[in-house]
Amino acid sequence: MIVTVKFFAAYQEAYGCSEMRWEFPDNTPVSAVLERAIAQHPYLEQWRELTRFGINFEFVSRNTLLKNEDEVVLIPPVSGGLSMNNE
């Protein structure tokens, strides 16, 4: 099956693009997308436990099975924004 993988933040920096199409066998969990990314770019290991998964615009657990033509997002932690501290 083929899925579209969308990259943000550290993942986009690692791949130098915002998305790729990857092939996986049937009955593959979404966590395999992260495993492939870490295998190809080992320094992404630091984000393994902090990354969330999205499939077709919904947050999912790491054990959710992929389906052909799914759109997968690896969501690393984000920072920034406004501080609520007035110091």
Model-predicted regions and their roles:
Residues 1-87:
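Ubiquitin-like/PB1-type beta-grasp interaction modules and other compact soluble beta-rich domains
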